[in-house]
């Protein structure tokens, strides 16, 4: 474990400006405020999903996935008390002293635990967040030595929470399978032995939120993600490749549902993979808990339904592990290229000779305010 003194934690920072490692290029910075809410993302009640309302719910879910790849669900059946306990324990964990959190430091390739910014290696710019992550399904993947032992009750609550969200995810995948004209279990079966990873995000107050992101723009690689968020706001989505962004309106008692790349491919591109990011603010902290439902590493990725007039969007079947590897390699390569281009621009600017004094004087004279006589002339 790295010494506490050498590990920067945003939750422990009282610095008035951002460290350079968190400052993003201008084209990546937020353009919409964390609390400038939009109701464009559909909110769908799951009341009656196993009864007469199923056809209507199926149509609404399919429509949301075709338009956004993201929607919110209410009346989902997950106990409100359990959700409250999960959120409380998460907040209590991030309030622990740095040395307690860093006991579970996951840097250096450890699977599960605590880290700042991201568990991905090679990122050029850090995200303004702290996370704790654990693997909960298949059950054999649970490494309790990487699960926090503080606060008290963590293990029992997160096991129950994980189980309930696995059930909700499978129910939603069943609806999407039917919308594709397939058997109810088709999407779940395509995952083979479904993985589940939970990532608890804590976004502390940020001294310069206009210069950074809590979580950079991305799509999730897996099948479906269920996000619990508090009422602060900060989740943003785009459906036009980043030209415009909206901040998703937090709704008490809801889960945000994101479709990932895997579901996008299985639907042959019919359903969008949610393009999203998280912004931060200087007023208050924000908490979110993302539960990722992913296929097994050896599950084959290929469209399950190709409609008339369509061509498969994949040339050939590949494993999910290979799909994920290609995605990460591409993202890291793009980040490296962008970093290199930025460094080259900085070197070129530093190499430019300063303007001669006569040019500076002329520019200053041009900016000098006109006299009243000149204005009225």
Curated annotation (Swiss-Prot):
Cofactor note (record): Binds 1 Fe(2+) ion per subunit.
SUPFAM superfamilies xref list: Clavaminate synthase-like (SSF51197)
Domain Fe2OG dioxygenase: 191-295
GO molecular function: 2-oxoglutarate-dependent dioxygenase activity; flavanone 3-dioxygenase activity; L-ascorbic acid binding; metal ion binding
Keyword Flavoprotein found: no
Function comment: Catalyzes the 3-beta-hydroxylation of 2S-flavanones to 2R,3R-dihydroflavonols which are intermediates in the biosynthesis of flavonols, anthocyanidins, catechins and proanthocyanidins in plants. Converts (2S)-eriodictyol to (+)-taxifolin and (2S)-naringenin to (+)-(2R/3R)-dihydrokaempferol in vitro.
Name this polypeptide is given: Flavanone 3-dioxygenase 1
Organism: Oryza sativa subsp. japonica (Rice)
């Amino acid at each position: 474990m790295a010494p506490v003194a050498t590990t920067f934690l945003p939750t422990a920072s009282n610095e008035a400006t951002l460290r350079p490692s968190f400052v993003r290029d201008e084209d990546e910075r937020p353009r919409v405020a964390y609390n400038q809410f939009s109701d464009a993302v559909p909110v769908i009640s799951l009341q009656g999903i196993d009864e007469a309302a199923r056809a209507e719910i199926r149509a609404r879910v399919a429509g949301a996935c075709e338009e956004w790849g993201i929607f919110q669900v209410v009346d989902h059946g997950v106990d409100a008390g359990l959700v409250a306990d999960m959120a409380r324990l998460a907040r209590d964990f991030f309030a622990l002293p740095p040395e307690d959190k860093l006991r579970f430091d996951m840097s250096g390739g450890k699977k599960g635990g605590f880290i700042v910014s991201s568990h991905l290696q090679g990122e050029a710019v850090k995200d303004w967040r702290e996370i704790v992550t654990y693997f909960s399904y298949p059950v054999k993947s649970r490494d309790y030595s990487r699960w926090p032992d503080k606060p008290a009750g963590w293990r029992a609550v997160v096991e129950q929470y994980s189980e309930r969200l696995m059930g909700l995810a499978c129910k939603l995948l069943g609806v999407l399978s039917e919308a594709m004209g397939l058997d109810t279990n088709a999407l779940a079966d395509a995952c083979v032995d479904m993985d589940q990873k939970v990532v608890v995000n804590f976004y502390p107050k940020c001294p310069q939120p206009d210069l950074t992101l809590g979580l950079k723009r991305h799509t999730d690689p897996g099948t479906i993600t269920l996000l619990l968020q508090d009422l602060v706001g900060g989740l943003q989505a785009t459906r036009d490749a980043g030209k415009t962004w909206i901040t998703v309106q937090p709704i008490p008692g809801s889960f945000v549902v994101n479709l990932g790349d895997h579901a996008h491919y299985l639907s042959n591109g019919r359903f969008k993979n949610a393009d999203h990011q998280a912004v931060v603010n200087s007023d208050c902290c924000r908490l979110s808990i993302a539960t990722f439902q992913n296929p097994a590493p050896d599950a084959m990725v290929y469209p399950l339904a190709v409609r008339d007039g369509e061509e498969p969007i994949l040339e050939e079947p590949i494993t999910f592990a290979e799909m994920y590897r290609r995605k990460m390699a591409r993202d890291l390569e793009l980040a490296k290229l962008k970093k290199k281009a930025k460094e080259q621009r900085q070197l070129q600017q530093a190499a430019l000779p300063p303007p001669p004094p006569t040019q500076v004087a002329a520019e200053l004279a041009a900016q000098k305010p006109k006299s009243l006589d000149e204005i009225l002339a």
